[in-house]
Design a protein with these regions (language model features):
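A solvent-exposed, charged loop/short amphipathic helix patch at secondary-structure junctions
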Residues: 125-154, 241-265, 312-319
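Aromatic-lined substrate-binding rim segments of carbohydrate-active enzymes
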Residues: 35-92, 151-179, 309
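Hydrophobic faces of well-ordered beta-strands that scaffold small-molecule active sites
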Residues: 3-9, 46-50, 72-76, 107-111, ...
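Active-site groove signature of glycoside hydrolases
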Residues: 95-156, 179-185, 290
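Glycoside hydrolase catalytic-domain groove-lining segments
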Residues: 172, 176-178, 182-184, 189-259, ...
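Short, acidic/polar
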Residues: 19-39, 86-97, 181-187, 271-278
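Aromatic-rich peripheral "rim/lid" segments of glycoside hydrolase catalytic domains that contact
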Residues: 5-8, 21, 291-359
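Boundary/entry segment of secreted carbohydrate-active catalytic domains
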Residues: 1-36, 45
Length: 359
């Protein structure tokens, strides 16, 4: 039984998107509260992963989720910054989580995600995008430009030394459950953590159901709850087969980014992928699942297929900007087919849990 049924919610992360300092240029607290209400009341989640860089936004969003009786998995993200800054940022987030916990909130903390890629100094590459390219140096890229090849096994001691320090910082400021969200290619010592999180969308290619079950099942030997921290795929035919590179279908060399030829929007296929994976994850023994992601404002929807960046997005809602070309424009959201399919599935699981006497 998937005890946690959630969605990931980006409050704005300092990725280099080319559309502002954070991945959410527009931030409006009332809009955020409306989106969190959609997550609790219509998507039928009982959990939400709140991640991002700005601590005030994290606090606002976590509070809104708690007010709607959602479990919050708080995940601070600080990309391409020195380790001491990352640790200070984590400590602040941990203190926030502890404050919420003491008020009776259901809150857990993760010390971050995919640090081999997000954090400099652990593998070759000066920037987030360069490190990502290097991890997948042998894959087919359109956007990424590898500058080296990464030996993830050789990088494991550096990663685990970093994670051990992060766990100490987290536990020094927070008394609840502490975890980490790892990409499948990261070789992690899970001893310092209460839960195992898998950033499942980082698989380099599509897998068979048996391969998925074997992968998730391989983590059960740690005797800790295994959570699918994030998973999803984009909104076009064949996206699942591209694995992690579902997003790599946009020509960004032009002034106006355009979807490459040969890709057809298909909301139904995206929805079917999620339903299939829910069954696989439950059969494999996962304790919870988080769909990635609720909204992706840097990828707005357009009725022009060439401009429809939402096609390359995992988001469950379309971002429809007032001014398509302006990242700072206001917007409205419109649920996609995957939203409705997931809502029905989560509602069904919730009814099953109630029938079994669960929470």
């Amino acid at each position: 039984m998937l005890s946690y049924r959630g969605v990931a919610y980006d409050t704005g992360t300092n990725f280099a998107t080319g559309q502002g300092d954070l991945s959410r240029t527009v931030w409006d607290e009332s809009a955020m509260e409306a989106e969190i209400s959609l997550i609790s009341d219509q998507l039928n989640c009982n959990s939400v992963t709140v991640y991002g860089t700005d601590l005030d936004r994290l606090a606002q969003t976590a509070t809104a989720a708690i007010e709607r009786e959602l479990h919050v998995l708080l995940q601070p993200r600080l990309v391409d910054r020195p380790v001491n800054e990352i640790m200070d940022h984590l400590a602040e987030a941990a203190r926030l989580a502890e404050s919420l916990r003491k008020q009776g909130a259901k809150v857990s903390l993760t010390v971050g995600a995919v640090h081999l890629v997000f954090t400099p100094g652990l593998i070759e590459g000066d920037t987030y995008h360069e490190r990502m390219a290097n991890v997948y140096a042998d894959a087919e890229h359109y956007l990424l430009k590898p500058t080296a090849r990464v030996d993830v096994a050789a990088a494991a001691p550096r990663l685990n030394e970093f994670l051990a320090k992060a766990a100490v910082v987290a536990r020094g400021n927070f008394s609840g459950s502490v975890g980490y969200s790892a990409a499948p290619f990261e070789v992690v010592d899970w001893d310092p953590f209460d839960t195992i999180g898998l950033m499942y969308q980082y698989l380099p290619s599509g897998q068979t159901p048996a391969e998925h079950k074997d992968l998730v099942g391989s983590y059960l030997r740690w005797n800790k709850p295994v959570l699918i921290s994030e998973f999803g795929t984009a909104t076009y035919q064949g996206a699942e087969k591209k694995g992690f590179f579902f997003w790599d279908i946009v020509d960004r060399a032009q002034d106006v980014p355009t979807v490459l030829d040969g890709y057809t929007r298909d909301e139904g296929e995206q929805a079917a992928y999620h339903l299939k994976m829910f069954e696989i994850f439950e059969d494999a023994g996962a304790a919870g699942v988080t769909v990635s992601e609720f909204i992706h404002p840097t990828h707005p929807h357009s009725t022009d297929p060439r401009l429809d960046l939402d096609t390359a997005s995992m988001a469950l809602v379309k971002t429809i900007r007032d001014d398509f070309s302006d990242p700072a424009s206001g917007y409205r959201v419109e649920p996609k087919e995957a939203f409705h399919a997931i809502a029905d599935h989560y509602a069904h699981l919730g009814f099953q849990e109630i029938a079994r006497g669960g929470r």
